[in-house]
């Protein structure tokens, strides 16, 4: 017959494990909460960094595109730009005129002035735009053309007008010269023989010496 102590079920080994699991669960949940917060913080920081990278790429793309468009415009206007070099204005019978393409500039960005006998046209464009991360985009463009005024044009009478299509028209009237008065030209009498006038001085001297020897 077995002793009674062997027949009684014993749960003593399981009790310490259950108590340890109940004791460690709050600490484990706290650790997982901290890890989750750290992961969220790292994710937010990564998103902010990605936004800055995207903003920088967008600005770089805009700058590259604007440079490409500007180069294309300059290449497309190269014949006209050559036509705006000094002494390139059209000189008519009664006026002087010059046509320039300034559609890239607004009226308040253009300046037209005369300096001695030259017409100087300048354009300056500047634009700044702020970004979301506190940076800014700066664009600056400067353009200049000169033309020589021909003789007979008064620099003080130069006028200019800007058309809606972006062309600047510069013109000035030519001064009307008074007609030359009728002036009689007197005829002077010369007593020297015509043959002697046509001979060179050396020939005339040799002829005179020959005549003296014959005498």
UniProtKB/Swiss-Prot annotation:
One Gene Ontology biological process: protein refolding
Domain of life according to the entry: Eukaryota
Positions of the UniProt region annotated as Disordered: 63-92, 176-215
Disulfide feature: none
Pfam families, alphabetized: HSP20 (PF00011)
GO MF annotation: an example: unfolded protein binding
One cellular-component annotation, GO: cytoplasm
Polar residues bias spans: 72-88, 203-215
SUPFAM superfamilies: HSP20-like chaperones
InterPro entries, A to Z: A-crystallin/Hsp20_dom, Alpha-crystallin/sHSP_animal, HSP20-like_chaperone
Keyword Amino-acid biosynthesis assigned: no
Domain sHSP: 78-190
Keywords: Stress response
Family of the protein in this entry: Belongs to the small heat shock protein (HSP20) family.
Protein name as it appears in the record: Heat shock protein 30D
Gene name per UniProt: hsp30d
């Amino acid at each position: 017959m077995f002793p009674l102590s062997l027949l009684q079920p014993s749960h003593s080994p399981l009790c310490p494990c259950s108590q340890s699991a109940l004791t460690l669960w709050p600490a484990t949940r706290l650790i997982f909460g901290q890890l989750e917060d750290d992961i969220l913080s790292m994710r937010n920081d990564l998103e902010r960094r990605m936004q800055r990278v995207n903003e920088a790429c967008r600005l770089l793309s805009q700058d590259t595109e604007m440079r490409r468009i500007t180069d294309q415009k300059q290449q497309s206007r190269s014949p006209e730009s050559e036509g705006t070099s000094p002494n390139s204005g059209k000189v008519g019978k009664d006026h002087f005129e010059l046509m320039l393409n300034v559609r890239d500039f607004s009226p308040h960005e253009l300046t037209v002035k005369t300096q001695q006998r030259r017409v100087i046209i300048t354009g300056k464009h500047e634009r700044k735009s702020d970004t979301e991360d506190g940076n800014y985009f700066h664009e600056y463009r400067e353009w200049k053309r000169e033309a020589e005024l021909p003789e007979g044009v008064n620099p003080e009478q130069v006028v200019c007008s800007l058309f809606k299509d972006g062309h600047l028209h510069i013109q000035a009237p030519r001064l009307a010269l008074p007609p030359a008065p009728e002036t009689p030209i007197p005829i002077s009498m010369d007593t020297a023989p015509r043959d002697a006038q046509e001979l060179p001085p050396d020939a005339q001297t040799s002829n005179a010496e020959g005549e003296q020897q014959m005498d």
